[in-house]
């Protein structure tokens, strides 16, 4: 029995010794620092066996996405790495880079800069990138300052260059390559194209090409146009009583193309058709093309006139006034054969319209005159409908005496700015007159033919006269504007023979 116990004890000792031999030490547990040039994410995943890893040196590795992912998932490990840019390796927290031309390509540069989150300045001396390529960099990195220089005309110039002299070059020498370089100078504000002797190697079409490329730069340039010296700085260009004709339009267009400061281009009686000039004006709205229109032999005005006063005209004769889009005051009254005011459609600024004693039948063209304040339709017996005036919400005064065809004035009730409505001799029912007084409490509605002093017709109290029998101030102002006391009509001051 004693022998069996001894054997059991021996076996137990042997088992204990065997068990102690199974607890072999793991050397990976001792790894706290590690250096590796990783090829990909898989190589970094293998590092997970080092559970006690504290520092990891990955300099020389190019798998930046994998490195950044590893850092995010292993905050306990201090990782050191670098980023290869144009053949040189930089710490990922680098703030400034200076890259020599020829050491980088745009796509590779854009890709690698994603891994430089603290980069704030990029220096590119003598860069070979184009303006469009530089714009791509700025678009992808809007907070990045990009400074660069370019080689231009044998010199190295900075992107902040503001002035350049091209007067010594020919138009042919300003080729596409040079144009691309110029486009890389966003701060360029002045380009000299005139030599000291006042000559230039550039034609207007060449200047236009430069302006298209450098929209923010002023071109210092002058040229001859129909015997007149014109400069790109001119704000006004005027030609008067000079035969230019329709054939001169291409030259005029070439000039307007390079006159960015011109706000007034006058072609007064230059033998150019109205339709041609209207198209020119439409194509160059900023230049305000102005010309003279003629009608019925004795009348003529510039197209930018604000006042027109003429009488005894026909509708077809004043059709030419459609080119006068700035008219504010229009008197075409006392015209027995005037049957349309279609022309006012083209006068959006019109405030006063006088078409008394005419055969007009339709007021709808006034729909395009939202600023209309005064309307005189005295003795316009063919008018029947006032509804188009509903759109003229700024109307203050209407004289419709002897407009016998009008029997309904209810469309006027909505015109809350009305101050005077003179009905005079008319076919408006008495009940409607009273209703108008109620519906338009702020308007002086008058249907009297004459006042107690015997003042006659449209001079009656309630229109041109105040209650005291004196001329109203608004009418005195209009007399001056239309120059009634001078018996003025448009074109009277200056007799001009129209060039054709």
Language model region names:
Residues 18-21:
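C-terminal motif of bacterial Sec signal peptides marking the signal peptidase cleavage site
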Residues 23-27:
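Bacterial lipoprotein signal-peptidase II cleavage site
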Residues 1-9:
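Bacterial N-terminal signal peptides that target proteins for export
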Residues 29-43, 49-65, 74-108, 112, ...:
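Concave beta-strand-loop units of leucine-rich repeat
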Residues 70, 436:
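Major-groove DNA-contacting interfaces characterized by cationic-aromatic clusters
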């Amino acid at each position: 029995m004693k022998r069996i116990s001894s054997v059991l004890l021996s076996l137990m000792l042997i088992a204990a010794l065997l068990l102690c031999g199974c607890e072999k030490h793991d050397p990976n547990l001792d790894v706290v620092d590690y250096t590796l040039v990783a090829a990909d994410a898989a190589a970094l995943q293998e590092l997970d066996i080092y559970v006690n890893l504290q520092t990891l040196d990955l300099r020389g590795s190019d798998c930046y996405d994998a490195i950044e992912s590893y850092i995010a998932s292993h905050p306990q490990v201090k990782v050191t790495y670098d980023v290869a840019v144009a053949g040189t390796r930089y710490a990922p927290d680098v703030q400034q880079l200076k890259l020599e031309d020829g050491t980088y390509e745009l796509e590779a540069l854009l890709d690698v800069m994603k891994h430089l989150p603290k980069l704030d300045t990029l220096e590119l001396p003598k860069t070979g990138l184009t303006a469009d390529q530089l714009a791509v960099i700025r678009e992808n990195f809007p907070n990045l300052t990009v400074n660069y220089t370019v080689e231009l005309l044998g010199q190295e110039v900075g992107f902040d260059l503001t002035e350049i002299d091209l007067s010594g070059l020919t138009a042919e020498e300003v080729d596409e390559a040079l144009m691309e370089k110029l486009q890389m100078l966003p701060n360029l504000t002045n380009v000299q194209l005139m030599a000291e002797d006042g000559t230039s190697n550039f034609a207007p079409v060449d200047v236009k090409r430069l302006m298209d490329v450098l929209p923010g730069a002023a071109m210092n340039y002058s040229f001859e146009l129909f015997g007149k010296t014109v400069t790109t700085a001119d704000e006004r260009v005027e030609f008067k009583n000079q035969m230019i004709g329709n054939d001169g339009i291409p030259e005029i267009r070439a000039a307007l193309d390079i006159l960015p400061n011109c706000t007034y281009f006058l072609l007064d009686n230059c033998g150019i058709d109205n339709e041609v000039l209207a198209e020119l004006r439409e194509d160059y709205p900023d230049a305000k093309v102005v010309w003279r229109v003629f009608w019925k032999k004795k009348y003529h005005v510039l197209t930018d006139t604000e006042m027109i006063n003429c009488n005894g005209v026909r509708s077809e004769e004043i059709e030419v006034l459609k080119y006068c889009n700035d008219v504010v005051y229009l008197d075409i009254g006392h015209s027995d054969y005037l049957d349309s005011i279609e022309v006012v459609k083209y006068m959006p600024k019109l405030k006063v319209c006088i078409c008394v004693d005419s055969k007009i039948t339709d007021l709808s063209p006034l729909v395009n005159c939202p600023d209309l304040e005064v309307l005189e339709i005295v003795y316009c017996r063919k008018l029947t409908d006032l509804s188009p005036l509903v759109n003229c919400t700024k109307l203050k005064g209407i004289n419709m005496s002897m407009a016998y065809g009008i029997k309904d004035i209810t469309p006027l009730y909505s015109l809350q700015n009305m101050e005077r409505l003179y009905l005079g001799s008319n076919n408006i029912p008495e009940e409607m007159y009273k209703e108008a007084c109620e519906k338009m409490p702020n308007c002086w509605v008058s249907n009297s033919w004459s006042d107690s002093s015997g003042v006659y017709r449209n001079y009656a109290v309630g229109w041109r006269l105040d209650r005291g029998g004196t001329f109203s101030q608004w009418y005195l102002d209009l007399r001056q504007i239309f120059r009634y006391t001078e018996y003025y009509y448009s074109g009277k001051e200056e007799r001009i023979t129209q060039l054709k």
